[in-house]
């Protein structure tokens, strides 16, 4: 497997504080002066992820270690984030929360801002870099010229960075509906951002999986336009016994050509 050793796990957005935010909660001065998200009950504490309450949590305030015991499943992360946004009833509070997440997004190298990494269909410029690590887990980096779009990317990366390919493919756009953010008639464009970034993550994940399987079988890697992903009446792509990561019964939810 061809893996870049320099591609490191990204810092994930900070989880919700149980106390009223102070200036220290927002190291970026732009956000300390303009935004003060309303206090929210910590959703992490309300979800039983099967860990001992006295044992160290697999979460930290700033990062989720990919090497930590993965009782922290992708579905758990998604549920935590959805619960957080659901608790914010005012649209402006959701916008502020996204801006907070945008500030935590790791910078993307200038060399990655190329047309091949552009996410199509977004009203703003969004770049997405995807790799597969030596353990067969997906690694994502992203950036945008819009702070709101950066917030979307930050949330999706927190959910999916370090996930197995089948976990990436298992997330649907409707799973993100509770996190929709819209102010002044911009709801649809922002819903499209969620959708387009997620779809790009999934399409390119499938391309990397197919390329890796072909490489290990000694076959010619498939061209992107040769890949047709389709989900019909519960049909699935069977697991390959060649590669070393779990992709058994991978659902192909979408009907599209890359």
UniProtKB/Swiss-Prot annotation:
Pathway where this protein functions: Cofactor biosynthesis; iron-sulfur cluster biosynthesis
Subcellular localization, as worded in the UniProt entry: Plastid, Chloroplast
Biased composition annotated in UniProt, kind: Polar residues: 15-32
Tissue: Highly expressed in flowers and pollen, and at low levels in roots, leaves and stems.
GO molecular function: enzyme activator activity
GO BP terms, alphabetized: iron-sulfur cluster assembly; positive regulation of sulfur metabolic process
Record keyword Cell cycle present: no
UniProt KW keywords: Chloroplast, Plastid
GO cellular component, one term: chloroplast
Active site (record annotation): 122
Chain intervals for the UniProt region annotation (Disordered): 1-32
SUPFAM superfamilies: SufE/NifU
Coiled coil: none
Chain's role: Participates in cysteine desulfurization mediated by NFS2. Can activate the cysteine desulfurase activity of NFS2 in vitro. Cysteine desulfurization mobilizes sulfur from L-cysteine to yield L-alanine and supplies the inorganic sulfur for iron-sulfur (Fe-S) cluster formation.
Family: Belongs to the SufE family.
Protein's name according to its UniProt entry: SufE-like protein 2, chloroplastic
Source organism (scientific name): Arabidopsis thaliana
Organism classification: Eukaryota, Viridiplantae, Streptophyta, Embryophyta, Tracheophyta
């Amino acid at each position: 497997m061809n893996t870049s050793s320099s591609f490191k796990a990204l810092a994930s957005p900070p989880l919700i504080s149980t106390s009223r935010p102070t200036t220290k909660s927002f190291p970026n001065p732009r956000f300390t002066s303009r935004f003060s998200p309303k206090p929210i009950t910590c959703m992490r504490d309300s979800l039983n992820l099967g860990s001992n309450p006295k044992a160290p949590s697999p979460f930290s305030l700033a990062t989720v270690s990919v090497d930590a015991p993965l009782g922290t499943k992708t579905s758990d992360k998604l549920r935590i984030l959805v619960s957080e946004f659901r608790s914010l009833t005012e649209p402006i509070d959701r916008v502020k929360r996204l801006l907070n997440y945008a500030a935590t997004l790791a910078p993307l190298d200038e060399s990655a801002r190329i047309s091949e990494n552009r996410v199509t269909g977004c009203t703003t410029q969004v770049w997405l870099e995807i790799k597969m690590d030596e353990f067969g887990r997906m690694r994502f980096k992203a950036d945008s010229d819009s702070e709101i779009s950066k917030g979307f990317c930050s949330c999706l990366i927190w959910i999916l960075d370090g996930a197995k390919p089948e976990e990436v493919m298992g997330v649907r756009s409707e799973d993100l509906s509770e996190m929709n953010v819209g102010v002044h008639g911009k709801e649809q464009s922002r819903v499209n951002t969620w959708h387009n970034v997620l779809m790009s993550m999934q399409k390119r994940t499938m391309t990397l999986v197919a390329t890796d399987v072909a490489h290990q079988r000694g076959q010619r890697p498939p061209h992107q336009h040769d890949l047709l992903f389709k989900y019909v009446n519960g049909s699935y792509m069977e697991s390959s016994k060649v590669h070393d990561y779990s992709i058994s019964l991978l659902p192909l939810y979408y009907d599209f050509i890359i």
